[in-house]
Amino acid sequence: MHGIANPCQRPVRTGHILDPDNNLIQDEITKLTNYAQHHKMKINQAKTKVMLFNQSRTIDVLPALVINEDTHLETVDEIKLLGVIVRNDMKWHSNTKQIISKCYSRMWMLRNLKKYGANEEQMFETYIQQIRSISELSCPVWNGALTQIEVISLERVQKTALAVIRGANHTSYADALEHFKLSSLKERREALCLKFAIKAYKNPKFSKWFPKNVNTINTRRQQRALVPIRSRTLRYGKSPLPYLNELLNTHLMKIDKT
């Protein structure tokens, strides 16, 4: 796994270490190392990390992985992949915190534009291009698993921006949304996720993510277009594929009704 990692080392709660001889991941790393050497390439060892996804509270088996027999790979709690912070507990508060911080760090653009006499339209375009775009980065990955607190914190970014843009004319967030013909960030993220799901559903390469429901048994309930993804845990139920499946199923059912 490559990316920008959190430097903190994961605590060994139980002291269990996976024997390298029984570690299939080590076999894959060895194959990758041999492939790189054969093709005269080099693995960036500083950016290669290990992340353990384990929800057990009693056993914490850490894989002891090495490259070139002399470099042990660091085990991390979180890592940044393509701009998104992924945690080993599959929660998104670190990623949400990063997004909000970036958005507020650009709020000075609006204040400076206002200071130098920019009109509402110019400030609004700046907000859309420079701030809102950041708040939506890779949202199909994490939107389904946001907590209510995270949803509110993200929405506050747009509330603040519209208040700055409207200035003395600002009365309420609802009025500002109506004035600019905007949807809330929550509604917009859901729309973006649905758009992504529809594109994936229509793409032959990714359509297998959303298998069609071929059940022919007649019931009183409306037949779902896609096979629902079953989950034993709420954590998995809020992960990308089950979340996008439910969004797309709901969308297709609405189309059938019309």
Task: Walk through the language-model features, giving the residues of each.
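Active-site palm subdomain of RNA-directed nucleic acid polymerases
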Residues: M1-H16
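Catalytic palm subdomain of template-directed nucleic-acid polymerases
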Residues: V12-Q37, Q55
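Short, conserved micro-motifs composed of acidic
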Residues: D27, N34, K42-D77
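Conserved pre-motif C helix in the palm subdomain of viral-like polymerases
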Residues: M1-I4, I128, P240
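Basic, alpha-helical interaction scaffolds
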Residues: H72-V141
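Short linear motifs embedded in intrinsically disordered, charge-biased segments
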Residues: T147-T258
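Hydrophobic packing residues in well-ordered alpha-helices of helical domains and bundles
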Residues: I25, I29, I43, T96, ...
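Acidic, serine/threonine- and proline-rich low-complexity regulatory regions
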Residues: R111-F124, V141-I149, Y173-S184
